Amino acid sequence: MSGHSKWATTKHKKAVIDAKRGKLFAKLIKNIEVAARMGGVDIEGNPTLYDAIQKAKKQSVPNKNIDSAVKRGGGLEAGGADYETIMYEGYGPNGVAVLIECLTDNRNRAASDVRVAMTRNGGSMADPGSVSYLFNRKGVVIVPKGELAEDDVLGAVLDAGAEEVNDLGESFEVLSEATDLVAVRTALQEAGIDYESADANFVPTMQVELDEEGARKIFRLIDALEDSDDVQNVFANFDVSDEIMEKVDA
């Protein structure tokens, strides 16, 4: 099991009840605005926008905020910012490779925030390409387990291009090529299977096994990075056991 995948789903669940709720909402709204700007406001022809809206709704972002973000992105309402996507690369404690995906209207601010978070939490910046080769862009769909068995999920998505289904404890992770993400998500919907999120993420090709101390260090680093308004996603190639995850979550 990918420690980062399990951490991400746990973090995702906790984020709506902690002090970072407003920050999470702002990042979800930003995703919607950019998706509308890049692909248009019609969700039927813009699956990225559809997924961004669904993700926001599942986190209880108010509909009026979602509608305004779509309109700003589509140029139908004033106030939209000129965001750009920037990827930063680095290494965390214990040699963990880290990719930081920023969505920002201020490149200098984003670079400064990332560098400060890295250097203050045992990390270091790396040259472009020195870390990204350790990851592949994949479609990642998270499915709440509920009463589902792994075979139920696998049977629904296999013909849609899914490559594997991983058990994350309270949920299943469905991996596919990024180009098959919409097909996999649609197959789940047609099978009546609810999903928590559907994203094109960077998935590591190899992982660093961490002990409890190492896990706490990398979690502190990722928390510091995600505290920046400009950081949308953090991907890292670590793995931890279920026992260590329980200790860290305690």
UniProtKB/Swiss-Prot annotation:
Recorded GO CC terms: cytosol
Keywords for the protein's UniProt record, in alphabetical order: Cytoplasm, DNA-binding, Transcription, Transcription regulation
InterPro entries: Integrase-like_N, TACO1_YebC-like_2nd/3rd_dom, TACO1_YebC_N, Transcrip_reg_TACO1-like, Transcrip_reg_TACO1-like_dom3, YebC-like
Location in or out of the cell: Cytoplasm
Listed GO MF terms: DNA binding
Pfam families, per the entry: TACO1_YebC_N (PF20772), Transcrip_reg (PF01709)
Top-rank taxon: Bacteria
NCBIfam families from the UniProt entry: PRK00110.1, PRK12378.1, YebC/PmpR family DNA-binding transcriptional regulator
Family: Belongs to the TACO1 family.
UniProt name for this protein: Probable transcriptional regulatory protein SCO1521
Organism of origin: Streptomyces coelicolor (strain ATCC BAA-471 / A3(2) / M145)
